[in-house]
């Protein structure tokens, strides 16, 4: 309650701060692509509407990956972007924890791709949700 009173009493100082914070969160939420949950990825995959791109190393991919995903390690995204861009499906980027996918998404956006999704929490979130890997 005190915080609300402070913000109201100091409106001219607090309003710009609140606006900056909101803009920061909005810009980061779309950076690299739209973040989606594991359940949303399952829905896209079940409808055969997603190309799932696993950005982890080949070793990590071979030790367990999401069904029907392809492996394009993060370092190869620029070089192999034509494989991704040629897809008519939505692109879902998956990495270990979700942060590398943002960088790859930015790279693909620069190449002209628009329909990009990022698995929130990456493969770690997938495992914590007890979802299967092959």
Where are these regions (language model features)?
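Conserved histidine-centered catalytic loops in small-molecule metabolism enzymes
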Residues: 41
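Rhodanese-like catalytic fold shared by cysteine-dependent sulfurtransferases
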Residues: 1-38, 47-50, 58-90, 99-134
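Short, surface-exposed ligand- or partner-binding patches at beta-edge/loop junctions that are enriched
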Residues: 94
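Active-site flanking residues adjacent to catalytic metal/cofactor-binding acidic residues
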Residues: 53
């Amino acid at each position: 309650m005190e915080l609300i009173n402070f913000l109201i009493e100091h409106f001219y100082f607090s309003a710009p701060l609140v606006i900056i914070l909101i803009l920061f969160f909005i810009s980061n939420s779309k950076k690299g692509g739209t973040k989606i949950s594991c359940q949303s990825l399952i829905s896209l995959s079940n409808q055969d509407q997603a190309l799932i791109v696993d950005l982890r190393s080949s070793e990590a991919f071979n030790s367990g990956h999401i069904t029907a995903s392809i492996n394009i390690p993060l370092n190869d995204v620029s070089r192999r972007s034509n494989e991704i861009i040629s897809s008519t499906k939505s692109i879902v980027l998956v990495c270990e924890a979700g942060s590398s996918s943002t960088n790859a998404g930015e790279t693909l956006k620069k190449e002209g791709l628009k329909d990009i999704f990022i698995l929130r929490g990456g493969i770690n979130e997938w495992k914590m949700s007890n979802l299967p890997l092959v």
